[in-house]
Amino acid sequence: MAIAWMDSYTRWAADFRGEHLRSWMRDHTEVPAVAVVLYLILVLYVPENVMAHRNPIKLRFLNMLWNLLLTVFSICGAYYCLPRLWEVLTSPRISGLMADPNLGPNAPPPKLPGSFYNSACAWNDKIFFDGFVGLWVAAFVLSKIPEMIDTVFLVFQKKPVIFLHWYHHATVMLFCWHAYAYTISSGLWFATMNYCVHSIMYFYYFMCACGMRKVIRPIAPLITMMQILQMVAGTLIVLYTYVKKQFMGEFCAVNNPSLRMGLLMYVSYLFLFSQLYYRSYISPAAARTLRMANGEKKGK
């Protein structure tokens, strides 16, 4: 049965075409709009009006399964996307490219060398829009709606939902939907970075849900630092594509709204994650909390 399932998956993934999903997403812009409205109701209304006088719901086991699922999902995404990004960056000739249909049925595929410019600006459906990598980039985009379930666990367990948490979930979902629907040549960068960071982040959450928070707590600053580095890289990539297209007049397959939204999004994330890191690990209050925790351990 497992072999049959893998054969079906292999055929389906190999035949995946991103254009079909892109057309559907363009025709259904109400989906992210409805999702974000329901999400804001969850964040801004439910804690004070539904859960205020109720006891926290015990969801530890479901939370464990959820974080384990997202860990495996992120690892699978990184498995497919990271090697392709490396090839698009370094290969003498990017493999599997599609010939331009406007040049006729016998036109040869383009000879596109790997480079940072081509990884950020070049467009060919076979780079990361079709096939196995295309499927996992599409899965990355679509996963931003179910990932909001992270917040469901916080709300119904009556745990704090900080601004960074819900702002990040809402805005990244809206940006990913728009960027995929209207083409973004740097999308492989964003998907790969997110998959890699989330592989570690959700494993950390899984271990915490298993009751091992004290054991794994020392890597928490590392995870936040990885997120900050992701935002630095994202900001630089958006700036690079913006300069190439707007100031140097070079081709870059990303529309202007995506450039503006991407820059605003990444800069705001960089500020908020840096602020979180300072408040959690550097500020005097964080230092006092750490000293108290160490004192408690010594006392025990």
Swiss-Prot record:
It catalyses: an acyl-CoA + malonyl-CoA + H(+) = a 3-oxoacyl-CoA + CO2 + CoA. It is an enzyme of class 2 (transferase). Involved in the synthesis of fatty acids. Elongates C14 fatty acids to C18. Required for the maintenance of the global lipidome profile in this parasite. One of its GO terms (molecular function) is fatty acid elongase activity. Pfam families: ELO. It is found in: Endoplasmic reticulum membrane. One of its GO terms (biological process) is fatty acid elongation, monounsaturated fatty acid. InterPro entries: ELO_CS (IPR030457), ELO_fam (IPR002076). Its EC number is 2.3.1.-. The chain crosses the membrane at residues 31-51, 61-81, 127-147, 170-190, 192-212, 219-239, 261-283. The active site is at H168. This is Fatty acid elongase 3. One of its GO terms (cellular component) is endoplasmic reticulum membrane. It is a multi-pass membrane protein. Keywords: Endoplasmic reticulum, Fatty acid biosynthesis, Fatty acid metabolism, Lipid biosynthesis, Lipid metabolism, Membrane, Transferase, Transmembrane, Transmembrane helix. Belongs to the ELO family. Pathway: Lipid metabolism; fatty acid biosynthesis. A motif (HxxHH motif) lies at residues 165-169.
